[in-house]
Curated annotation (Swiss-Prot):
Cysteine protease that plays a key role in cytoplasm to vacuole transport (Cvt) and autophagy by mediating both proteolytic activation and delipidation of ATG8. Required for selective autophagic degradation of the nucleus (nucleophagy) as well as for mitophagy which contributes to regulate mitochondrial quantity and quality by eliminating the mitochondria to a basal level to fulfill cellular energy requirements and preventing excess ROS production. The protease activity is required for proteolytic activation of ATG8: cleaves the C-terminal amino acid of ATG8 to reveal a C-terminal glycine. Residues 50-59 have a biased composition (Basic residues). This is Cysteine protease ATG4. It comes from Cryptococcus neoformans var. neoformans serotype D (strain JEC21 / ATCC MYA-565). The gene is ATG4. GO terms for molecular function: cysteine-type endopeptidase activity; protein-phosphatidylethanolamide deconjugating activity.
Length: 1193
């Protein structure tokens, strides 16, 4: 058989003597086989000489033809490089090439040439899937190597890929033609093997690098071992590579590479987009869904800095930024991030006040009003910063899309921005992806609504200045409406605080606000003769004493306690927010807004400025009540709320629920009369009108004993107790309603009702609404709620001890200054300073005085006497003396004269004693218009706390969340000023779409029979420690004598009606009950109401002839509980030998055992009492007792 020729379809070699001088080598190898028969089966032929060997060369030939047809697909020659396959690596290949050179020179075949073919045959057995994985890994490795080797080379836009492909094709064609004329098919096989084993710098490598460079526009690839071919990298130079490998390289290689200089890049155009057929493009499109930009995006962020260290994290930063950009809208609602101004035109309701929604506003045709030039804004500096951080030389403007033109806007002055200004502006802008993870969490990117970088569309939504100047002229600025924003900022916002005094236990007389402790905590009164004393800049000595922990508030520096409520006090803070905004609503009005700059003492000249100054003083005083200090001057501090919650079952440091917070607010507000607001809570989501009216009429007897203003106003209503419950009192009422509107989330049927609550003029917001946390919701718009987040920790503001308030008394019959319920027109008469020295008097602060006529007794009592009604003394040493009506009324002495002198000292100077102050006269007067209308005590509050500190109680960043993210457990707050306001509230509740709570007249009541019967059945147990030792009981009295009150130390007997008693004993028992009621009216009632005395029960038992039975049956029967079964009367019997402190849950019932002889009693052994229920269910023996206590016989 003749040797194969080029015409044979199955031949892998083409031997042409004219083209390849080494053809004799192949002919010598084939000549021994010329006389053989046709080739045997493949399994009988060795691999180097078999059919598979021919198929291998056929595959190489096909690949060569394929390379000629598709030169741009030469990426295969680098996809299996630098990988050890079957033990062959780069070092072995270099040794193999050295051994191959003599064979080429000698032009004769050798064993190594055959071994080479054998190795190639083994390599072909790798699977296609494994090759694809290798190709993918080499793709990333090659591009990463290019980034390190040439950091200063600019990126190539996608529009230039087709041009590069054409250049690669032309270079490949010319190179192939040269190779076909200079090397044989055997050399072609050798080069193909080399391309898979060692790095080569042939045209395939150069073009593959360019192809990978095209893919850099959409993602920065990692670095591999291969370095890019540049003029600055001598190791990758074509000539050096050729000399090192010994492989001839065409001269057109250098020309093709020089044509790809970054200074000769083709201009992009819309018709030359990247071809998706190339392999690198196919690889990049696999990850296109994770990338923030498309083919028309700006240059890659990997070239924005020349640092190769920072580029390593740019891939993860880009992916993170892309995911963040796409999910920012959803994450903003899920995580309750700060809301961005939107274009919702629906009405905004904030605590009963309607504000218009967004309205389009077009700015003037000037760049000075655009967000790009606003300091600290998010627009205008994005492109400038990108230019300053980009590569060394600026890229041509034609390479930048029209939507990404550099912002060349000038400042309003018309002067170009200095580099320092550009750098400062860039530092305030959003960071780029090249910053990596180190720049993601800087202050300018903490907002999830602000992107790290990305497409122009995202920056356009966020107000950046990346558009062309023509688009900037018609751009609309999206911001919150001014009216809504001012109202939102004026809402008081309490957050976590730290660095305050430890929360430790307080004595009972200091835990609940009391007038003695409150007024005793004030500092020395202001001297009316010294206007400079109104300006307080440093804490007084009492304030320092309070801060040091050596005061008399039950805690000291050595005690340990929580000094921060971070993590557990969010419900307390939102509860405080409800109360303080209710106080502002009542005292300052719903239309009050926090001033941008508070009025100064010296600048207030007009009537409006004076009114604003007084309002600001009231505002500062109310905030001081909520400061974090255990002083009695802070009745609503977190200390007292936490300790009250402890009394309600929650330990300090444990998260409070809405019901616990409502209970703490109710206890503190109802005990502090000067606030002018009482709290009424709903029961099982039901508001009872009787509870609301009772709260408005809460007595202030303790405060009346100190304040003559309250005393005079209350005296007129002391005899009108019945009308007191039916008419509205002098206090406003804060109604707190705890509701739960679902299981895991709010039921959507209640959405409209929740939104309607913010339209009530009585609304003060909602506290709670988050799982295991609490927000303060203040408004609604469409299906979203505006809220204040208390989960922000700030340092506590120290308390400044105010001076003792003073007040002047006008002539007899004159009206006093306005009260806590006064309106704006009544406030003008408030706070006249002392000008009549013969009638100085002290009351609560002037804003809390009642507009009532002073009675004659009060004028005589307070018209003459000491300068101050209450001197500054220690709270523990206050003793009030009663004033006799027959004498001493003119002296008006309320405090004992043995007051420590130190309590009157101020700055080292001692005040005069009350007796010496009796004839005190003031000759000084203040001519200022402000001083004549504003109380100096109130002016003290205008300077006591700096405005920056009070600003921490207001939030300027609006947050918004959807209704779907609301937690079903929440606390609703409504404040009613008067009866008309309350009736309007009731009507609005009845019109809610879905009833989430109701209003009823009064709580239903049940008869005592049912209560007593239920008590005796459900709670039959008692504590054994309530008994005293046998033999210590006091003697009983005869049944004919009335019960002595001194002989009873514990709860009295509880008895119900005698419906189950025998008919023969009903009349006598009824008389016994009346007799007991007549004798026990003055006894203290603990637990259930008393209806019968202890001896009455014994007389009743004697009448039914049970005494003889007891003596016969033994002592066990004596201890049985008479009554208490479902079908009998509820009779609870107790011994008089109970301890002085009864059980708090209920009065334990049992009967002592005595043996009576005549008028004296002999003590019998005391045995534990038994429940009467036991005898009824399991009778001990027949014929003993019936369940109602009667004899069964």
């Amino acid at each position: 058989m003749s040797s194969p020729t080029s015409t044979s379809p199955k031949s892998s070699f083409v031997f042409s003597p004219t083209s390849f001088p080494h053809a004799a080598i192949a002919s010598n190898n084939v000549r021994p086989r010329t006389n053989l028969p046709p080739p045997p089966p493949p399994d009988r032929i060795p691999p180097p000489k078999g059919r598979s060997h021919q198929q291998k060369f056929k595959i190489l030939r096909k690949e060569k033809d394929k390379d000629r047809r598709q030169p741009i697909d030469l990426e295969d020659d680098w996809t299996i490089e630098d990988v050890t396959v079957n033990g062959d690596g780069v070092e072995q290949e270099s040794q193999y090439l050295d051994d191959l050179q003599p064979e080429e020179n000698e032009l004769k075949p050798g064993p190594r040439f055959l071994e080479m073919a054998n190795r190639e045959e083994k390599k072909e057995k790798t699977s296609k899937s494994r090759g694809l994985v290798k190709k993918t890994s080499r793709l990333f490795g090659r591009d990463k190597d290019k980034d390190r080797g040439k950091p200063e080379e600019p990126a190539v836009t996608g529009s230039s890929s087709s041009t590069l492909a054409a250049m690669r094709q032309s270079s490949s064609t010319s190179t192939d033609s040269t190779t076909s004329r200079s090397i044989t098919s055997a050399f072609t096989r050798q080069n193909s093997i080399q391309s898979r084993r060692s790095p080569r710098t042939s045209f395939g490598q150069a073009h593959s690098r360019r192809a990978s460079q095209d893919s850099q526009m959409s993602w920065p690839a990692p670095r591999s071992i291969r370095s890019s071919t540049t003029s600055h990298d001598p190791s990758s130079d074509p000539q050096n590579s050729a000399s090192s490998t010994g492989v001839p390289i065409p001269q057109r290689q250098g020309a093709s590479m020089s044509s790809l200089s970054r200074y000769s890049l083709p201009h992009p155009n819309g018709g030359t987009s990247r071809s998706p057929d190339t392999f690198p493009n196919k690889m990049s499109t696999w990850f296109s869904h994770l990338l923030p930009v498309s083919s028309g995006s700006p240059p890659s962020s990997s070239y924005e800095t020349s640092s190769s260290i920072r580029k390593q994290s740019s891939v993860a930063a880009s992916l993170f930024n892309a995911a963040r950009q796409k999910a920012v809208d959803g994450v903003r609602h899920l995580l309750d991030s700060e809301a961005q101004p939107d274009k919702c035109m629906d009405t905004i309701w904030v605590r009963g006040v309607a504000h218009p929604g967004w309205r389009p506003i077009t700015p003037e045709n000037s760049t000075s009003n655009l967000p790009a030039l606003e300091p600290g804004g998010s627009g205008g500096g994005v492109e400038d910063r990108r230019a300053s951080l980009s590569m060394n030389g600026p890229s041509p403007n034609s390479l930048r899309p029209s939507s990404w033109k550099r912002n060349t806007s000038l400042p309003p002055t018309g002067q170009p921005q200095s580099p320092a200004h550009v750098h400062t502006q860039a530092s305030n802008q959003t960071t780029s992806p090249s910053k990596g993870f180190t720049g993601i969490w800087n202050p300018s990117t903490l907002s999830l609504g602000m992107p790290i970088g990305g497409s122009p569309n995202k920056e356009k939504e966020n107000g950046s200045g990346a558009e062309s100047p023509s688009k900037k002229k018609s751009k609309e600025i999206v911001k919150w409406p001014e009216q809504f924003y001012d109202d939102f900022k004026s809402t008081v916002w309490f957050t976590y605080r730290n660095q305050y005094a430890p929360i430790s236990s307080l004595s009972p007389n200091l835990l609940i606000p009391s007038p003695e402790a409150y007024y005793a905590s004030f500092g020395p009164p202001l001297d009316a003769t010294s206007p400079s004393s109104l300006r307080v800049t440093t804490p007084t000595a009492a304030a320092q004493q309070s801060a040091s922990g050596s005061g008399g508030w039950g805690w000291s520096k050595e005690e340990r306690g929580l000094t921060s409520d971070a993590g557990w006090g969010c419900m307390l803070r939102t509860g405080q927010s409800l109360l303080v905004n209710a106080l502002i609503h009542i005292h300052l009005g719903r239309d009050w807004r926090v001033p941008s700059t508070p009025a100064s003492f010296s600048e207030a000249t007009t009537t409006q400025e004076i009114a604003a100054l007084k309002d600001y003083a009231k505002y500062a005083q109310m905030l001081s009540w909520f400061l974090d200090d255990p002083s009695p001057l802070c009745p609503f501090s977190v200390h007292r709320m936490a300790l009250i919650g402890k009394e309600l079952g929650k330990e300090v440091g444990e998260w409070f629920g809405p019901s616990t917070a409502a209970g703490a607010l109710k206890t503190l507000a109802n005990s502090f009369a000067p606030c002018g607001v009482a709290v009424a809570t709903a029961t099982d989501s039901i508001i009872y009108k009787s509870d609301v009216y009772t709260a408005s009429n809460l007595p202030s007897d303790d405060w009346n004993s100190i304040s003559p203003t309250f005393n005079s106003s209350k005296k007129k209503r002391r005899g009108d107790n019945e009308a007191k419950e039916e008419k509205w009192g002098k206090r406003a009422v804060l109604i707190l309603v705890g509701v739960r509107l679902g299981l895991d989330g709010v039921n959507p049927i209640y959405y409209d009702s929740i939104k309607a609550l913010f339209t009530f003029p009585q609304s003060v917001g909602i506290a709670g609404g988050r799982p295991s946390s609490s927000y303060y919701f203040v408004g609604s718009q469409a299906n979203h709620l505006f809220y204040l987040d208390p989960h922000l920790t700030r340092p506590a503001i120290p308390l400044q001890i105010p001076p003792l308030p003073v007040h002047s008394a006008k002539e007899k019959g004159s009206t006093e200054s306005s009260s806590i319920m006064s309106t704006a027109e009544e406030e003008s008469e408030e706070g006249v300073m002392i000008r009549t020295p013969e009638t100085p008097r002290s009351t609560t602060p002037s804003m809390f005085s009642a507009p009532e006529h002073v009675e004659d007794e009060d004028q005589e009592e307070w018209g003459q006497g000491s300068k101050y009604k209450l001197d500054v003394v220690d709270a523990d040493g206050v003793e009030v003396e009663g004033i006799d009506d027959d004498k001493g009324r003119n002296e008006g002495k309320m405090i004992r004269e043995e007051v420590p002198k130190s309590s009157f000292e101020s700055n080292g100077a001692a005040q005069e004693q009350p007796k010496k102050q009796k004839g005190f006269t003031s000759t000084a007067s203040i001519d200022s218009q402000v001083d004549s209308q504003v109380d100096p005590h109130m002016l003290w509050y205008t300077t006591a706390y700096p405005d920056p500190l009070l600003r921490t109680y207001h939030c300027e960043k609006i947050k918004k969340m959807p209704l779907s993210g609301l937690d079903p457990s929440m606390l609703l707050g409504f404040v009613c000023k008067d009866e008309d306001d309350f009736e309007d509230f009731v009507e609005r509740v009845a019109q809610l779409p879905k009833k989430i709570f109701t209003v009823q007249d009064e709580m239903p009541s049940w008869e005592e029979d049912d209560d007593a019967g239920l008590e005796s059945v459900s709670e039959p147990d008692f504590e054994g420690d309530e008994f005293e030792e046998p033999g210590t009981a006091k003697p009983r009295f005869d049944s004919s004598s009335p019960v002595n009150e001194d002989s009873l130390k514990g709860p009295r007997v509880v008895s119900a009606s005698t419906t189950a008693t025998p008919l023969a004993a009903k009349e006598e028992d009824h008389l016994d009950v009346e007799e007991a009621n007549s004798t026990d009216d003055d006894n203290e009632s603990i637990g259930t109401t008393t209806a019968a005395g202890p001896m009455d029960i014994a007389r009743h038992l004697n009448r039914v002839d049970l005494s003889s039975k007891r003596e016969q049956e033994g002592d066990d029967d004596d201890g049985e509980w008479v009554g208490g079964t479902p079908s009998s009367q509820g009779v609870l019997v107790e011994p008089p030998s109970l301890k002085g402190t009864p059980s708090k849950s209920r009065s334990s019932a049992f009967e002592p055992r005595y043996e009576q002889n005549g008028e004296t009693e002999q003590e019998r052994p005391v045995f534990p009492a038994r429940n009467r229920m036991e005898s009824w269910v399991e009778p001990v023996c027949e014929g003993k007792e019936a369940p109602n206590g009667d004899n069964l016989l």
